[in-house]
């Protein structure tokens, strides 16, 4: 399984409290992720406010439990510079071999599923399925058609 995580409203924290506070929050989130996953799972800071987790879980129900555990742990308020910060994360998951035969495919599909979580609102997870890809292609085609209309 690949999980793709994106902190919700991280830019607001960076912009209002400064990049040092944002960096502290990233470190706290990393510790919370370590506390949430199983031994042997691999966590990486993907960049910015994104993380990935590589897990040997390949069962949908176990994936849901892992995502729920992460959401619960991240949601616990933290103190940075004497200010209480409520944090949440959007998660997308893809499962080997159903969703991809290699890590690139799994990351791409987990990222798409994470985007769906973002559109649902913060603090949620989505397990990838083929309907996500179909909906994204429909949206892309609609945007292309709208641009054609605007430009004509």
For every predicted segment, state its role.
Residues 1, 8-38, 44-48, 52-53, ...:
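Conserved long alpha-helical elements within nucleotide-processing catalytic cores of c-di-GMP signaling
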Residues 2, 51, 89-93:
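A structural signal for short, well-ordered beta-strand segments
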Residues 2-4, 127:
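Core hydrophobic beta-sheet residues of small sensory/regulatory alpha/beta domains
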Residues 7, 48, 90, 122:
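ATP/adenylate-binding site constellation spanning eukaryotic-like Ser/Thr protein kinases
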Residues 15, 54-58, 75, 96-97:
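Residue-level recognition of strand-loop junctions within catalytic nucleotide-signaling folds
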Residues 43, 69, 73, 83, ...:
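Cyclic nucleotide signaling catalytic output domains
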């Amino acid at each position: 399984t690949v999980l793709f995580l994106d902190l919700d409203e991280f830019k607001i924290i960076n912009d209002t409290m400064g990049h040092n506070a944002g960096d502290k929050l990233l470190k706290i989130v990393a510790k919370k992720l370590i506390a949430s996953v199983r031994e042997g799972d691999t966590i990486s800071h993907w960049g910015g406010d994104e993380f990935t987790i590589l897990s040997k879980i390949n069962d949908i129900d176990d994936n849901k439990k892992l995502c729920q555990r992460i959401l619960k742990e991240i949601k616990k308020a933290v103190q940075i510079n004497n200010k209480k910060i409520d944090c949440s994360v959007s998660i997308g998951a893809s499962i080997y071999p159903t969703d991809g035969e290699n890590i690139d495919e799994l990351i791409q599909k987990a990222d798409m599923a994470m985007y769906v979580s973002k559109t649902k609102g913060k603090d949620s997870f989505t397990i990838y399925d083929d309907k996500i890809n179909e909906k994204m292609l429909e949206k892309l085609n609609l945007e292309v058609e709208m641009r054609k209309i605007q430009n004509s």
